[in-house]
Design a protein with these regions (language model features):
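Surface-exposed assembly/interface segments
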Residues: 1-187
């Protein structure tokens, strides 16, 4: 037993140190914005963010003097139901957040693929800008939806990388939570 040599026993180990409370998602984005203005968009790699956290971050990004975009992936399948209004897509649409883009996917990072495509555009080059609608999302498996589910997401201004019967898949509709296409806000 080498635990004593490694000081890994109750009597030889370091005493516990009091920690600090974790910051909220909004506090994290506010700290990032205060530290650096050299970022244009953000997403969270935390699948456990509550809807309220997304609403708080979206409100911060919306109110920011610097133009930024917040991306959200909704994985809750209840968002596919037109009658369910407690998901992030429904709430953000209700608030008409023009600087927030939402996508539904079983992949919790699907919106990262969409933003990766959009944020790598060279606006100085000729014919280099893209329309986000109808694009492929590298690394994301397309969702097989019913017509009713697709209509529910569209009504919530929630994008989706959707599979079609002709063996293609596209990102639809390329809209923000507010009344605009992504391409009208980006850039």
């Amino acid at each position: 037993d080498i635990s004593a040599m490694l000081r890994m026993t109750a009597s030889t180990g370091l005493p516990p140190v009091a920690g600090t409370d974790g910051e909220t998602a909004k506090e994290a984005v506010a700290a990032l914005a205060d530290k650096s203005g050299d970022w244009y968009g953000c997403v969270f790699a935390d699948e456990g963010l509550a809807v309220e956290d997304h609403l708080d971050v979206a409100a911060f990004v919306e109110a920011s003097a610097k133009a930024r975009i917040y991306g959200v992936t909704v994985t809750d399948s209840r968002a596919l139901d037109a009658g369910y209004a407690e998901d992030a897509a429904s709430k953000l649409k209700e608030l008409a957040r023009k600087r927030t883009i939402v996508a539904y996917s079983r992949n919790p990072y699907a919106i990262v693929s969409a933003l990766g495509r959009a944020f790598t555009v060279n606006f100085s080059a000729n014919r280099s800008t893209i329309t986000l609608k109808f694009k492929q999302l590298p690394g994301v498996v397309a969702e097989g939806l019913t017509e009713t589910q697709a209509q529910a997401l569209e009504a919530k201004r929630c994008n989706v990388f959707a599979a079609y019967d002709n063996d293609t898949a596209i990102f639809q509709e390329g809209v923000m939570s507010g009344p605009a296409y992504f391409d009208e806000i980006h850039g």
